[in-house]
């Protein structure tokens, strides 16, 4: 079934309070998707971000980002006052998140919420904490201890806490009981709002595609609470870390720094950590997109003490053994795989054997590094087509910065014109393709340049900040988008049927 969707992270939604949230603007965006005939809303990971603000480097794989808790909903619940929200600074530019300002203002307000919340705890708060205890207990304690240590990484804590000695943990739970409850409350509020939003999305006939990074951050509750699952030495420092090897465009390669999984240990317990993770993410989202899928076939391991990726080596991953174990425990998995880099025959075989759809990126079709596999006429039907991902420049940004020969080829191949708009022409290439699903970033629909780029890999600062404003997402844009969906057979089925009924009614009235 041909379908389409839009990539728009929650942080990028309009908001008067510095960052997109799960409130009314999220519902307005869902209405926009509905009116334009979309089937899917794709978002980036919604876990709590750490110091670089990247959703791919989180303090927990299971927790939700407190930044996305909607303040107006908290006002309606009498946990905040609007005047309090308006009294804090939220950044000076409505098109970007100011994370420094965001952190200070948001947490000061959430402390006020906590004081009121604890006076009259909701009846289901205790049951929420009990139900989610398997990850929530470690996460809340981890965050409370981070605060107590001035934010330093857990592997720099005193030995008894670093190694999770039972006596030290018991004392910490008593000493920081109030802080632990604060972090549990944040998760309660997050998931209460998330499930309400997801229900609204699904009632419209729309599904959420959520990103799951293959690796977790070293400074996370995941690693602190499960050290045996990762390649750590006796001091709990990473023996090897993740990254990508050097190539013609990066002499040093990419040093990501994430600790690597100890796949041999994971196999012994039936991949229980991965089972818990995929089970949780499959509940959170309707479809899971796994980032860096090739890492399950083989992964690049770099010595933990190195400062470049030059001395790394490829090692064998778990392959289909992991996915057989997951499907045995969880049933059929709804997964999209990111299969865009270092594609060897064995990686391609793993993608094929998994049965999961892979990805095609239209921008790559005109990039000499990637070649013709990404040209739309070469796509299989069983794939997800993107104009670009969160790591790409926007279409208009690419048109202004790519080599002239690449831009010329794109113009000729897709018949790009200024009259239609270069962004609409390239999106048309994705929608017109035979790929079952086509997804385009909201920045390309709005038509912004490089200022709307979400992330530039291997750079620090200026990433994950872009935001839309309410006036950029309107009915006129939805109607234009719908026409393309109609033209290329991608209108969501129920919307198509509603449109037919409306046309019949209009014909009767005219008669």
Describe the role of every protein-language-model region:
Residues 44, 207-209, 213, 287, ...:
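Outer-envelope exported proteins of Gram-negative bacteria
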Residues 183, 188-215:
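Conserved, well-ordered alpha-helix/loop/beta-strand core segments that scaffold catalytic motifs
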Residues 9, 15, 53-191, 216-439, ...:
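Alpha-amylase-like alpha-glycosidases and glucanotransferases acting on alpha-linked glucans and related
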Residues 24-49, 284-285:
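Catalytic domains of carbohydrate-active enzymes, especially glycoside hydrolases
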């Amino acid at each position: 079934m041909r379908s389409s969707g839009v990539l728009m992270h929650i942080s990028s939604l309009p908001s008067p309070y510095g960052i997109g949230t799960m409130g009314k603007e999220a519902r307005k965006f869902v209405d926009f998707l509905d009116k334009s005939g979309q089937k899917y809303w794709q978002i980036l990971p919604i876990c709590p971000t750490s110091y670089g603000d990247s959703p791919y480097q989180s303090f927990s794989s299971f927790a939700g980002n407190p930044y996305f808790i909607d303040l107006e909903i908290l006002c309606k619940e009498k946990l905040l006052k609007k005047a309090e929200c308006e009294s804090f600074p939220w950044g000076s530019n409505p098109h970007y998140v100011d994370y420094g300002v965001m952190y200070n203002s948001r947490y000061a307000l959430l402390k006020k919420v906590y004081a009121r919340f604890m006076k009259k705890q909701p009846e289901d708060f205790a049951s929420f904490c009990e139900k989610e205890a398997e990850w929530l207990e470690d996460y809340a304690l981890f965050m409370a201890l981070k605060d107590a240590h001035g934010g330093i990484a857990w592997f720099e804590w005193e030995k008894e806490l670093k190694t999770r000695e039972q006596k030290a943990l018991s004392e910490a739970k008593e000493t920081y009981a109030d802080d632990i409850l604060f972090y549990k409350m944040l998760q309660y509020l997050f998931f209460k709002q998330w499930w309400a939003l997801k229900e609204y999305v699904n009632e419209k006939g729309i599904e959420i595609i959520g990103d799951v990074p293959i690796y977790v951050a070293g400074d996370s509750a995941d690693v602190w609470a499960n050290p045996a699952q990762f390649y750590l030495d006796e001091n709990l420092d990473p023996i090897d870390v993740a990254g990508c090897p050097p190539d013609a465009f990066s002499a040093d390669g990419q040093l990501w720094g994430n600790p690597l999984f100890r796949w041999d240990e994971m196999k012994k317990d039936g991949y229980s950590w991965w089972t818990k993770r995929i089970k949780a993410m499959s509940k959170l989202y309707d479809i899971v997109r796994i980032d860096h899928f090739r890492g399950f076939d083989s992964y690049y391991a770099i010595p933990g003490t190195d400062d470049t990726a030059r001395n790394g080596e490829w090692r064998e991953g778990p392959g289909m053994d992991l996915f057989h174990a997951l499907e045995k425990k969880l049933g059929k998995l709804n997964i999209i795989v990111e299969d865009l880099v270092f594609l060897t025959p064995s990686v391609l075989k793993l993608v094929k054997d998994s049965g999961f759809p892979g990805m095609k990126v239209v921008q790559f079709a005109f990039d000499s590094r990637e070649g013709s596999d990404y040209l739309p006429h070469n796509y299989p039907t069983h794939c997800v087509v993107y104009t670009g991902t969160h790591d790409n420049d926007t279409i208009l940004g690419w048109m202004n910065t790519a080599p002239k020969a690449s831009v010329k080829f794109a113009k000729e191949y897709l018949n790009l014109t200024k009259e239609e708009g270069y962004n609409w022409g390239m999106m048309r290439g994705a929608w017109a393709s035979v790929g079952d699903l086509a997804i385009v970033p909201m920045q390309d629909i709005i038509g912004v340049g490089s200022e709307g780029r979400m992330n530039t890999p291997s750079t620090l600062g200026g990433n994950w900040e872009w935001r839309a404003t309410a006036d950029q997402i309107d009915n006129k844009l939805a109607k234009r988008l719908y026409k393309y969906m109609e033209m290329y057979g991608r209108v969501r089925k129920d919307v198509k049927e509603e449109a037919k009924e409306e046309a019949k009614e209009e014909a009767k009235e005219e008669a």
